[in-house]
């Protein structure tokens, strides 16, 4: 379960990293976890991401306005992914495209969050 959440968080982080900087919004891991929970079934090999999952990914993408927010989301996703058993990396990486969110990064548990701006 934790891995799925990490993958979902990674997807959200990638989405946030691609967002243009705007007014600062202090994001935390609790918020990231909450937005990504609906994606857990999918990252554990279940059927395609739900509408609720995609809404969470879009919300995170829109809320991650600053580099700091995007890096926070990235680190939160990595932490969550470490705890998910039966994590399907392909499903996790496909979330942005399946949710119609353009992310120019590959979602992975070993992404270097410090390189996200």
Curated annotation (Swiss-Prot):
A lipid is attached at residue 33 (Cis-14-hydroxy-10,13-dioxo-7-heptadecenoic acid aspartate ester). During brewing process, structural and chemical modifications of the protein occur. Both unfolding of the structure and glycation should increased the amphiphilicity of the protein, leading to foam-promoting forms that concentrate in beer foams. Residues 1-26 form the signal peptide. It comes from the Eukaryota. GO terms for biological process: lipid transport. The keyword Secreted does not apply. The keyword Signal applies. GO terms for molecular function: lipid binding. InterPro entries: Bifun_inhib/LTP/seed_sf (IPR036312), Bifunc_inhib/LTP/seed_store (IPR016140), Plant_nsLTP (IPR000528). SUPFAM superfamilies: Bifunctional inhibitor/lipid-transfer protein/seed storage 2S albumin (SSF47699). Disulfide bonds join 29-76, 39-53, 54-99, 74-113. Keywords: Disulfide bond, Lipid-binding, Lipoprotein, Signal, Transport. Aleurone layer of developing and germinating seeds. Plant non-specific lipid-transfer proteins transfer phospholipids as well as galactolipids across membranes. May play a role in wax or cutin deposition in the cell walls of expanding epidermal cells and certain secretory tissues. Belongs to the plant LTP family. This is Non-specific lipid-transfer protein 1. It comes from Hordeum vulgare.
């Amino acid at each position: 379960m934790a891995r799925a959440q990490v993958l979902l968080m990674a997807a959200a982080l990638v989405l946030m990293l691609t967002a243009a900087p705007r007014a600062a919004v202090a994001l935390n891991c609790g918020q990231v976890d909450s937005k990504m929970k609906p994606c857990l079934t999918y990252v554990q090999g279940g059927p395609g991401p739900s509408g609720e999952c995609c809404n969470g990914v879009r919300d995170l993408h829109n809320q991650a306005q600053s580099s700091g927010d995007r890096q926070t989301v990235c680190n939160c996703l990595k932490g969550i992914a470490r705890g998910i058993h039966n994590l399907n990396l392909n499903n996790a990486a496909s979330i942005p495209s399946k949710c119609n969110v353009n992310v120019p990064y590959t979602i992975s548990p070993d992404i270097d969050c410090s390189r996200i701006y």
